[in-house]
Amino acid sequence: MWAPTRARLVVAVVGEKGTGKTKVVEGLVRALRAKGLKVCTAKHVPEEDFSLDRPGKDSWRHAEAGALAVTIVSPGEIDTIRRFRLKEAEFDDIVALASQGCDVLIVEGFSSMAGQRPDVLKVVVVRGPGEAKAIASEGRFKPILAFVGPGEAEGLKVPYLGFGEVGSLADRIANMVLKARAKGDTRLFLGPREVPLNAFVKEVLKRIVLAFASCLKGVDIRGDEDVMVFILGQEGDKG
């Protein structure tokens, strides 16, 4: 089982091909890293036959033999390759894999998987104001943090930013992360998957766990700690 240490904030940069999504991702990563935040990214590649591995390589032979995951370690890099069909992988699984140890996970693409998820903020990259207004009226993406594109737009309920204004978008994201840090977080995992919890359940679970922990010898509880509960060995655990 991979470590389910999900990022505090997940942001999906979505939009049509050729609109500049990667440029926006680059700008956000640089700006957030400059603020001291840990940032991870994930990129959706639509090509069916795409693979980082190569037939005949030792790592490829490991996978062909049936290894669930193959980790390749070199002096300057560690890569892990897992084989599965994207339709078999829920978005939560992708997030769990991609965001280990990070404050923010930025995903490029994944429109169909993340487009309507309320726990994933969307930055929609467009070709112009007209496209932004059309997308806003269609309700294809929710919630939208901002549109990014050329020109200026009026009448939108969310900010419309130019490519040179990505820094201000990073400021908003950083503030959200800092607020989440300040209040602490509570998460419940069954196997590799995170179970959605409402605010009331989070608070009750947190109080129970911290109250129990405070009774243990040598444990000093402040009350603002993050709480993560892992239940292992669930049916369907993918490793």
Residue ranges and their predicted role:
Residues 1-14, 18:
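Extreme N-terminal, non-catalytic leader segments
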Residues 100-104, 145-239:
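C-terminal accessory "lid"/substrate-recognition subdomains
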Residues 81-113:
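Phosphate-binding/switch loop-helix module in NTP-utilizing enzymes
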Residues 21:
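Conserved lysine of the Walker
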Residues 4, 29-86:
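N-terminal phosphate/diphosphate-binding loop that engages ATP/GTP or pyrophosphate donors
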Residues 105-109, 120-127, 142-150:
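Short, hydrophobic beta-strand segments that form beta-sheet elements in well-ordered domains
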Residues 99, 109-120, 126-129, 133-137:
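Active-site cofactor/cluster-binding pocket
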